């Protein structure tokens, strides 16, 4: 019997266990099976955007950093990009549940 597919936003992170954006970024990359450069890169395919958005969501949930700081750690993205992507992802996750 096949194991249930895990939601791509859930990377198994406890916010209190990760103390830096770089640790969150590395953990998300590991959970998604991609290199960190995929999260910081400019690719727009699903294999790059899903881990990137999961990083945004995990970093926002930790509540330690501003959207600008999160965007910089994600390869120089603007704070509005971080907010828009994370809001969309969290809204989709709520409607699926």
What residue ranges belong to the model's regions?
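Short, amphipathic alpha-helical "recognition" segments used to contact nucleic acids or chromatin
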Residues: 48-65
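General nucleic-acid-binding
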Residues: 1-27
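Short, solvent-exposed alpha-helical "recognition" segments
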Residues: 84-97
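Residue-level preference for well-ordered alpha-helical positions
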Residues: 29, 60, 71-72
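Short, Lys/Arg-enriched N-terminal segment that forms or immediately precedes the first helix
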Residues: 31-45
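Conserved catalytic core of nucleotide polymerization and phosphodiester-bond processing enzymes
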Residues: 13, 34, 67
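Short, basic interhelical loop/turn and adjoining N-cap
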Residues: 66-68, 72-85
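Small/polar glycine-rich anion-binding or flexible loop at a beta-alpha turn
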Residues: 42-47, 72-75
């Amino acid at each position: 019997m096949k194991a249930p597919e895990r939601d791509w936003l859930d990377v198994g992170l406890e916010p209190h266990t990760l103390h830096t954006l770089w640790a969150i970024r590395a953990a998300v990359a590991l959970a998604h099976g991609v290199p960190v450069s995929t999260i910081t890169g400019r690719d727009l395919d699903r294999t790059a955007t899903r881990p990137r958005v999961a990083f945004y969501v995990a970093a926002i949930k930790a509540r330690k950093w501003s959207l600008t700081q999160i965007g910089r750690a994600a390869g120089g993205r603007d704070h509005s990009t971080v907010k828009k992507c994370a809001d969309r992802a969290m809204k989709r996750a709520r409607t699926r549940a």
